[in-house]
């Protein structure tokens, strides 16, 4: 079956902003005017189509990134309504990565908020072309040109209005289109009866001023246009439109539009602009990946290229496990077998779905450029590549770091234990940086993640989405142990309690292993000093001790153990005796090998206004941080540092208080480093006191 829309007429866009800028209402209106829904849903009524989880409808916020397809002016538009709550995990960035363009929604009253700065920088990181919709122009205090100034100054964007509001607050009656040089007056409350007319007399001077600025801004992005503009001081409507599109695609400019989604004004013009100015899949660089031989390759947006797609979200759903995919090349057909090249496992495609929020349209195939969902994938998780078995490729994927912080979690009522297990399993499937395990000593359930904020949000989701109330322990840092010297260790387990005794004797040589090697065991027993059947139990005893630690109860890493000697008894020796002897030898060896404690170091990047630079650097130093670099750009300071995770608890609150809410930071795991002796002694004595 041929594709319904040529690739040139496909738009994959995200609608992103800070909380309460009106993203979801904006998406609702887009769906209403494009005919996907026939009745408008209001977020505050709990009826919004994209807020399809019951918990979202209760709270009037968007928790998950809902993917919806619609059409406008004979174009397919796939929309992701992203959560406004931006935390520091990788989820939001992944959403950004599968988009080709973004509508950044700003509130006409609140303007640029700290959170909108975060969203903007994430779009910068993935070089996503964007346009701005200044929403809530009907609100008291709305000021379109003030928001334009904030975007230019605080976000350093070459933003230029392509529209102007006619009136504001309660008097918002229409919009001036500076490209067409026409006014659009809204005649009814539903926003369907729109009159295209001449610009009102009282707005002509302002419109002429901003149209001249628009022409100048557009001309500067293109050599041919600048020649025309210098000669005639005028650009035609077609030249303006093509210049704006070119400027958006090459990140040279950001068009500003305005309106009020809630009052049904400006949404159709916004849809026109999506079609006119945001990129199709063929307008952005082809996705890069690695072939099995390690060479780099690209996959062009083309139905005839080998199939490749990226799983960007996994969600539990009444219909089963939904895996959202972005199709980059080729065709994916229902019932086919594909390769998950990230895990090197085959998967069967049971059903293919295009989502229209709680409405689902089953399709026989997804094609290059599509956003859709797959049912039936058993082993695919967020960030995995799906491709053809004949032409495998692993698409650019994000490094998924190991968790560095853990907390014990238990349900408030014992009857909720099964619900808690299901909730944790479901959350872990969605987020690969979230891990669940059981502490072998206490039998407590332990959850681990990338930081305090990450775990707070997941625990909040357990309550909201799965109705499980949980008690959470204090955050624990995942320390590690290792050794710095070489030595011998010996363990002899001999017990006689009448009848058959127990006897095992193990001698080992211990030395530091290669970084990242974990636990390495070498058997050098010769001549049957210790029978073969006792070697494995001895190794098993060492491994278990290695996992539970020796000096402070943390896993021991990067150690090489060679079993060189030992003895046994024909009658009294057993596998259990050698397991215990192996553990004893390991502990003996570690104590002689200068054991040390390691702690996770975090790569911390702080962005603050220049005025706060001194106090922020001082605060990082007081947290045992090492400042590695700093830069100042237009009054915004960036500080790069490495700080122990143990010193970063509560930092988000502290940073907000030190910078009046204007500072933001990102934090990710860097490496393990030796803990200073005085700090290590305190940790060891505390843990030994608890054991």
UniProtKB/Swiss-Prot annotation:
GO biological process, one term: ribosome disassembly
Gene Ontology CC terms: cytoplasm
Major subcellular location class: cytoplasm
Protein localization: Cytoplasm
Xref: NCBIfam families: EF-G, PRK12740.1-3, PRK12740.1-5, PRK13351.1-1, small_GTP
Binding site for GTP: 17-24, 81-85, 135-138
Keyword Protein biosynthesis: yes
Task performed by this protein: Catalyzes the GTP-dependent ribosomal translocation step during translation elongation. During this step, the ribosome changes from the pre-translocational (PRE) to the post-translocational (POST) state as the newly formed A-site-bound peptidyl-tRNA and P-site-bound deacylated tRNA move to the P and E sites, respectively. Catalyzes the coordinated movement of the two tRNA molecules, the mRNA and conformational changes in the ribosome.
PROSITE patterns noted in UniProt: G_TR_1, G_TR_2
UniProt record similarity statement: Belongs to the TRAFAC class translation factor GTPase superfamily. Classic translation factor GTPase family. EF-G/EF-2 subfamily.
Superkingdom, natural source: Bacteria
InterPro entries linked: EFG_II, EFG_III, EFG_III/V, EFG_IV, EFG_V, EFG_V-like, EFTu-like_2, G_TR_CS
A Pfam family of this chain: EFG_C
Record's signal peptide: none
Boundaries of every tr-type G domain copy: 8-282
UniProt name for this protein: Elongation factor G
